[in-house]
Design a protein with these regions (language model features):
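FIC/Doc superfamily catalytic core
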Residues: 1-127
């Protein structure tokens, strides 16, 4: 559930400040930002598209190749999972389920290739 409209400005200010100062890996940062943006829900319509656009922007500033990869298409193809991951994260009260889904989706774009900084996508998941 989105916060009341009078809190949106403060939440967005905090989110953008966090983005500017985050030391997390850009893949993780982009996913957390995307989730928090969706939670804040600053617009009446188009929040999903804007969240995905922000994620692409964050990733492409890290690795310009992301500006040309079909992140939006992959998420659209897995739309039910996308919304389920959002709901699961909302229920859990934290972004981990959504971050895990988005990282898996990003790995699906270029399965088996290195994204840099020692991160490698693979089909193997630890339990």
């Amino acid at each position: 559930m989105a916060p009341p409209s009078y809190l949106v400005h403060g939440h967005m200010t905090n989110l953008l400040t966090w983005l500017a100062t985050s030391d997390d890996h850009p893949l993780v940062t982009s996913c957390i930002f995307h989730y928090e943006f969706e939670f804040i829900h600053p617009f009446e319509d188009g929040n999903g598209r804007m969240g995905r656009l922000w994620q692409t922007l964050i990733l492409s500033r890290w690795k310009p190749l992301f500006a040309f990869l079909p992140v939006e298409t992959v998420i659209r193809e897995r739309q039910e999972e996308y919304y389920a991951a959002l709901a699961q994260a909302d229920s859990a009260g934290e972004s981990t389920p959504f971050v895990e889904f988005l990282l898996d989706a990003a790995c699906g774009i270029e399965r088996g290739r290195y994204f840099g900084y020692g991160m490698h996508c693979s089909r193997h998941r630890s339990s």
